[in-house]
């Protein structure tokens, strides 16, 4: 299928890790967490003779491999909030929720605060220090969306944009929603 063509490198990575799990009895996921795979340890992964139960364990371990990297979002949120609490903006930026790959924060309606958050949050979202996710061309990234006047309208701020660009974008959106 198209999915498997598009993600063949990722698919191969998972298959290689599952083959290793059949030798080790566990698969190592994000941040070194080990997920035990006792059934895989009893089979030769990748052969045509893997029992259904071991195949199911392989699917679960494969899902854990990919889904565990959702912890990168948590790592970014913790690192960002540490910076917030050490900054003059500790009362201006509040964490609200983490959902999969999104960090929801409430930011005071102040250009300096928004600019600071746009720089520091994106810096933490770009973090790529785990050896298994380091790559010369594929980089992690993110963008800060401002929702105004409500959750149905998102304005994406360009990364590393100067304050003037942020102000211009936000002013434009405000004028669109306050037209008579």
Where are the regions that the model predicts?
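Conserved catalytic core of nucleotide polymerization and phosphodiester-bond processing enzymes
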Residues: 1-180
């Amino acid at each position: 299928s198209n999915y498997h063509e598009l993600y063949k490198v990722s698919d191969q990575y998972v298959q290689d890790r599952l083959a290793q799990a059949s030798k080790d009895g566990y698969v190592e996921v994000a941040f070194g967490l080990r997920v035990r795979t006792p059934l895989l340890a009893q089979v030769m992964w990748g052969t045509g003779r893997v029992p259904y139960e071991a195949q199911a364990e392989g699917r679960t371990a494969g899902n854990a491999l990919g889904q565990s990297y959702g912890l990168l979002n948590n790592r970014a949120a913790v690192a960002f909030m540490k910076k917030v609490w050490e900054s003059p903006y500790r009362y201006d930026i509040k964490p609200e929720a983490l959902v999969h790959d999104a960090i929801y924060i409430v930011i005071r309606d102040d250009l300096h605060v928004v600019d600071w958050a746009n720089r520091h949050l994106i810096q933490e979202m770009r973090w790529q220090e785990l050896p298994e996710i380091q790559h010369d061309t594929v980089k992690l990234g993110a963008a800060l969306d401002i929702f105004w006047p409500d959750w149905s309208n998102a304005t994406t701020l360009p990364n590393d944009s100067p304050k003037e660009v942020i102000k211009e974008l936000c002013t434009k959106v405000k004028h669109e929603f306050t037209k008579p």
